[in-house]
């Protein structure tokens, strides 16, 4: 013989359950149906490709500035090397006593 919920709560000292109209967190589905599952492919994103093209165009527009800066740095390096070798030659002449 099965006891009713009211009789069971009365004999055991347990409060009667709340009305079934009250929503609780556990009653909600665990996963929203709008989320992708593992088997579905993502929709192609065009925003990233557009940003990449824009970035490439901006860099291409700065090519003259980048090339000029690179040539300046190469020139400064070569001048520094030339000065260094001249100083080495002067040092060797001083050690030999020719200067």
UniProtKB/Swiss-Prot annotation:
Q: Does the keyword Magnesium apply?
A: no
Protein topology in the membrane: Single-pass membrane protein
**Principal location listed in the UniProt entry:** plastid
The alphabetical list of record keywords is:
Chloroplast, Electron transport, Membrane, Plastid, Respiratory chain, Thylakoid, Transit peptide, Transmembrane, Transmembrane helix, Transport
Where does this polypeptide localize?
A: Plastid, Chloroplast thylakoid membrane
Q: Look up the transit peptide and give its residue range.
A: 1-60
InterPro entries in the cross-refs:
PetM_cyt_b6/f_cplx_su7
Give an example GO cellular component term for this record: chloroplast thylakoid membrane
What are the transmembrane regions? 68-88
Q: Which residues lie on this side of the membrane: Stromal?
A: 89-99
Q: Which residues lie on this side of the membrane: Lumenal?
A: 61-67
Q: Which Pfam families match?
A: PetM
Homology family: Belongs to the PetM family.
Question: Function of this protein?
Answer: Component of the cytochrome b6-f complex, which mediates electron transfer between photosystem II (PSII) and photosystem I (PSI), cyclic electron flow around PSI, and state transitions.
Subunit structure comment from the entry:
The 4 large subunits of the cytochrome b6-f complex are cytochrome b6, subunit IV (17 kDa polypeptide, PetD), cytochrome f and the Rieske protein, while the 4 small subunits are PetG, PetL, PetM and PetN. The complex functions as a dimer.
What's this protein's name? Answer: Cytochrome b6-f complex subunit 7, chloroplastic
Species of provenance: Chlamydomonas reinhardtii
